[in-house]
Amino acid sequence: MRFRNPVAIAFLLAWLPVNPGLAASAVVKDGSTIQLGNVTYRLDGIDAPAVDQPCIDEHADPWACGVEARDQLTKLIGGKPIHCDDIGIDPTAKKRRLGVCKIEGDPTSLSQVLVRQGYALNVEASATGRFKPDEAAAKNDRLGLWKGCFVAPSEFRSSKKDGALLGNSCPADRDTQIRAALFPDDLAMPASCNIKGKYAVRARVTGNVGIYHLQACRSYPGLTNPDRWFCSEEDAQAAGFRRAYNCRPGAKSK
């Protein structure tokens, strides 16, 4: 069978995944997520702060570590072509894939480099996880996140406020103050990430953890203390949030 409709062919090509055997330019979405063509990959074996996650630096000052983690990955890639070995659907976000991604010509994965630089955590449960030595070295050298105080990215995303404090600058006698800084009531909005997210029990009816609000939603102005900020609807959906029902039909994030 031969396709003669150029519009149909273009539509099909737009939804085909990038050939895993080819290298392509990457768009960095956060410290452990990149997009190649129309395919979004979470880097396998690691986790990094979401763009809106705050940390505390070595001087006990608030630190936008999620933004820095994203920028560090952008700097690491440096516009060079990226090759990803696709290893399947991301179990935490069905529209995304897991990938072992490398700069073309470099045998070391982006995952390993980010863990060694201290901007991502090893998440493999095994004590002999691939990146355990890299994480131990980063912690010992006070690199990246480890120079300050932070919570595991997964615990920030789930709002687990009583989780373990990580890093080399977490004095035990300041526990309450540190947690207040890591889970602030007034979470700062990262630049160009103006989608508001709010955890909501009613969202569980649809299998979600919260609701996101675009600027075109009637609820947007009245939501003054969002729990999360997202840069795109895809990011919000990957985090388990659904769109508010009071958004205008056809509304899009700006």
Model-derived regions, located:
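Electropositive
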Residues: 22-119
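Stable alpha-helical elements in mature extracytoplasmic
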Residues: 69-73, 106, 110-111, 115, ...
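Mature, structured domains enriched in cysteine- and short glycine motifs
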Residues: 121-129, 144-254
